[in-house]
Curated annotation (Swiss-Prot):
Homodimer. Its cofactor is Mg(2+). SUPFAM superfamilies: dsRNA-binding domain-like, RNase III domain-like. GO terms for molecular function: double-stranded RNA binding; metal ion binding; ribonuclease III activity; rRNA binding. Digests double-stranded RNA. Involved in the processing of primary rRNA transcript to yield the immediate precursors to the large and small rRNAs (23S and 16S). Processes some mRNAs, and tRNAs when they are encoded in the rRNA operon. Processes pre-crRNA and tracrRNA of type II CRISPR loci if present in the organism. It holds the Pfam family Ribonucleas_3_3. This is Ribonuclease 3. Its main location: cytoplasm. Mg(2+) binds at E67, D140, E143. It is found in: Cytoplasm. GO terms for biological process: mRNA processing; regulation of gene expression; rRNA processing; tRNA processing. Keywords: Cytoplasm, Endonuclease, Hydrolase, Magnesium, Metal-binding, mRNA processing, Nuclease, RNA-binding, rRNA processing, rRNA-binding, tRNA processing. It comes from the Bacteria.
């Protein structure tokens, strides 16, 4: 069921020019959806840099509120999709796969495949700094488009759109074993939750050179996890990343 918010968009935004309306029509063809109110899609493509803080002090005109909503819709649809598609996978495995499926890398790739980058509205400074090609901006715009579609046409329409984007990507993610690479998975989680990268520290090295063992801690945000251990720094880092990921994601087993 649509939330019928077209009047809100029309009150808070200037009318679309004929050129912009035609541009959005072409994008909708690429997306495979049709908006009742194209101003919703226009707002989803409007980056914060387009407006001064005075112009948009309530966040009504740029896309960040839609991004917030789209992130929630995307997460729910992705979780249900994986639950049905992977009936033999346990909760931790599903969570790892989902983290990659809705990551900034995946969403920015989706944005490029749909040519969303061609339709973004950016401020002059952001445009000059290469914002049209920044993964975070592309991923955020993808989530905002999902949120706009939910507002304009309802959950079912948004769900169909998201499933069309995600389903073809589930198998490649599984086949590449990205969900078993705990360092990559932890990096995704750290970026999404803390906007930072995990930092690994060798805290101890034991044994002779021919049989050495490394002990590694990892710091994510302000929290420290570990130690993980292994016969190489790489394997010890993977072990520490697994410990951190399981605790941060709430999948630590007794």
């Amino acid at each position: 069921m649509s939330l019928c918010l077209g009047h809100i968009f029309s009150r808070s935004r200037s009318p679309l020019t004929p050129e912009r309306r035609e541009s959005l029509r072409r994008l909708q063809e690429t997306l495979g959806v049709k908006f009742r109110d194209p101003t919703a899609l226009d707002q989803a493509l409007s980056h914060r840099s387009l407006f001064s803080s005075k112009e948009d002090h309530c966040g009504v005109r740029h896309n960040e509120r839609m991004e917030f909503l789209g992130d929630a819709v995307l997460g729910a649809v992705a979780a249900a999709c994986l639950y049905r598609a992977l009936p033999d996978s346990h909760e931790g495995d599903l969570a790892k796969t989902k983290a990659v499926l809705v990551s900034t890398d995946t969403l920015s790739d989706i944005a490029l495949s749909l040519r969303i980058d061609h339709y973004l509205l950016l401020g002059k400074g952001e445009e000059l700094s290469g914002g049209r090609h920044k993964k975070a901006i592309l991923a955020d715009a993808t989530e905002a488009v999902i949120g706009a579609l939910f507002l304009d046409s309802g959950f079912k329409a948004a769900e169909r759109f998201v499933l069309r984007l995600l389903l073809p990507r589930v198998r490649p993610i599984r086949e590449k074993n990205l969900h078993h690479d705990y360092k990559s998975t932890l990096q995704v989680l750290a970026h999404q939750r803390y906007r930072s990268k995990p930092e690994y520290t060798v805290v101890k090295r034991t044994g002779p050179d021919h049989s050495v063992r490394f002990w590694v801690d990892v710091t994510v945000g302000d929290a420290r996890f570990g130690p993980g251990y292994g016969t190489s720094k790489k394997s010890a880092e993977q072990c520490a990343a697994r410990l951190a990921w399981e605790q941060l994601s709430g999948t630590l087993r007794e």
